[in-house]
Amino acid sequence: MSKPSLELKGASFTLSVLHINSSDLNAVMAELDSKLAQAPQFFLGAPLVVNLSAIQHNDFNLHGLKELLLSRQLVIVGITGATTVLSKQAKDLGLAIVKAGKQSTTPPPAPRQTKIVKQNIRSGQQVYAKNGDLIIFGAVGNGAEVIADGSIHIYGALRGKAMAGAAGDPTAVIIAHSLEAELVSIAGQYWLAENLQQHSSDKSGCIRLNGESLMVESLPL
């Protein structure tokens, strides 16, 4: 019996959600450009779901938003929270209408292994712990990236980018003796440096998910 030429299978993916709070596209793009400048490689080519729940009028320029995002190498794959009229416009533009899924009550499997690095991670270097946690005895410098499918523990300063729960684990955490990061991300939810500064005045801390938002807890390190 010949193998079928295609298969339909269920799968889950972590997508970033861009919340639009203003119909002024110039203001939206100015703020977005500022964030992109802080972490350009993190967003490059990233598929986005656009949340329009804050936009209640139907003359919003959805086509213009799509073109502006494409010009910055960002790709809208769908929208959520839109009015009926804007949802129809989205379909005409070839965009999917995304409905928020229910939170799973089944916890993800625990990471199977731990990767230990006993050195500083310098600018331009990347360390990835697949299917496990990442422990670093050293500093993560500006321009460096550390990624783990599980949690990330840094016994030193975090000045670069740290992405935990890269495979979608919402229970992952990021712990560092000094939180000075350019970007932190857990299961696709991220903070840039400015967000981290707004939420934490202490150097050491633990970053984790609280529902769908990040939070930071002080640690006596």
UniProtKB/Swiss-Prot annotation:
Name the record gives this protein: Probable septum site-determining protein MinC
Family: Belongs to the MinC family.
Lineage of the organism: Bacteria, Pseudomonadati, Pseudomonadota, Gammaproteobacteria, Alteromonadales
Its biological purpose: Cell division inhibitor that blocks the formation of polar Z ring septums. Rapidly oscillates between the poles of the cell to destabilize FtsZ filaments that have formed before they mature into polar Z rings. Prevents FtsZ polymerization.
Superkingdom assignment: Bacteria
Organism name: Shewanella sp. (strain W3-18-1)
Keywords annotated in UniProt: Cell cycle, Cell division, Septation
Biological-process GO terms, alphabetical: cell morphogenesis; division septum assembly; regulation of cell division; regulation of cell septum assembly
Gene3D superfamilies, sorted: 2.160.20.70, 3.30.70.260
Quaternary structure and partners: Interacts with MinD and FtsZ.
